[in-house]
Regions:
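Acyl-donor (CoA/ACP) binding surface of acyl/acetyltransferases
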Residues: 1-35, 67, 71-180
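Hydrophobic residues in alpha-helical segments
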Residues: 29, 38, 60-61
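Conserved GNAT-fold acetyl-CoA-binding loop/helix
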Residues: 33-55, 66
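Solvent-exposed, charged/polar functional surfaces in cytosolic regulatory/catalytic domains
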Residues: 55, 59, 119
Length: 180
């Protein structure tokens, strides 16, 4: 059984989720504004975070998913999640992330995305990483632009969220472009 690595940036530690993180995951993810920009359920059911955290090592061992807890280094406070859903056969991954509302607009998402791109290309030897975001969440699009990802298009009414079809914008980056 391999261990989910720990990544560090200037302000963040990206580490494996621990069972003790469950209450904070539930608190942060349970905010409707956070759920609206993600696929998190709302309301966030009791017990969901515990079950989800318990499944993470198995997914990592299957080489299909790696999720990191985003933690503020200075205060050891969990602020969100970032992960890669990996398709090993095609050497690509879908990146997803979310932050608790108090941590929006501080550059944390950009810092975490940059670290996970480096991990994906340098350690996992991926060829491509892409990230969709809901059109209604333009801040995520700005994060992806800042790290050098290329806008690849819009998928109209691609997902159903809170009873409505929503549009998704897609960004991607190739390994060779990341290392330029």
């Amino acid at each position: 059984m391999a261990t989910i690595p720990t990544l560090k940036t200037d302000r963040l530690c990206l580490r494996q989720f621990q069972s003790s993180d469950a209450p904070e995951v539930q608190r942060l993810a349970g905010v409707k504004e956070v759920a609206a920009g993600t696929f998190l359920p709302h309301p966030y059911p009791d017990g969901t975070a515990e079950q989800w955290i318990a499944s993470q090592q198995e997914e990592f061992d299957a080489d299909t998913l790696v999720n990191f807890a985003i933690v503020l280094l200075a205060h050891d406070i969990l602020i969100g999640l970032i992960g890669l859903a990996i398709v090993a056969e095609h050497e690509h991954a879908r990146m997803s992330y979310w932050l608790g509302m108090p941590y929006w607009n501080h550059g944390y998402a950009t810092e975490a995305v940059q670290a996970v791109l480096a991990y994906g290309f340098n350690q996992r030897e991926l060829h491509r990483i892409y990230a969709p975001h809901f059109l209604s969440n333009p801040a995520s699009g700005r994060v992806l632009q800042k790290v050098g990802m290329t806008y690849e298009g819009r998928m109209r009414e691609h997902y159903r969220r809170f009873g409505k079809f929503v549009e998704v914008e897609l960004y991607g980056i190739l390994e060779q472009d990341f290392h330029r």
